[in-house]
Amino acid sequence: MSKSLVSQIAGTALLALMPFAALPASAPPKPYVVLDKSLSQLRADFNANVGKVRMLYIVGPTCGICLRGMSDLQETVYSKRGDDPRMVTFVVHVPTLGAREANVAAASRLISNRYTTHYWEETGITGKLMQQVIGDDKYVWDFWTIYGPNVIWSDEHLMPAPSFWQHQLDGLPPEKKLEPYVFAAKVDEFLAQVSAASATSTAATTGGKSE
């Protein structure tokens, strides 16, 4: 995806931070899901796709570096694998850098994939829970994870530990900085564990979405 499109979306996100009028009653459906603090919908979607490779990203929809990360993964992962039913992606947008719900729709355009669901989570609890999982002392966002097909989100108060993760934050291990091609190769490693036939069957019963 071109830098110009990322810049355009970043500009749109900043404009959305300005006061805006209420949407008309005929507004189209939102291209994202609004989560409550319990993250129950995200947890249900995650567990509904056990048996597949699941990516979970925690991003700020007004963060230029996050937008670049999504654009890079669109190029290295999604554009090369198409709508592979063996992999499902959850993109959780959190309120960093003054972001709010109005910023999510534009940012969601950066990853184009049938099996990707975007979420808005206004409390920021997602990053706090992931912070607990990795045992760090700073809030976690701009964070990119992969979960293997057998991982289950069993504890409603704690997120499962990622099978693999990278980041774009200062203060976390530099050797785990997001490298889009390394990340894509790791996705391929996990995909090799999943039967295409079983994933297709699951996709058919769930309508091809993670909701």
Explain the meaning of each model-derived region.
Residues 61-65, 94-99, 122-126, 151-153:
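Solvent-exposed loop/turn segments at secondary-structure junctions
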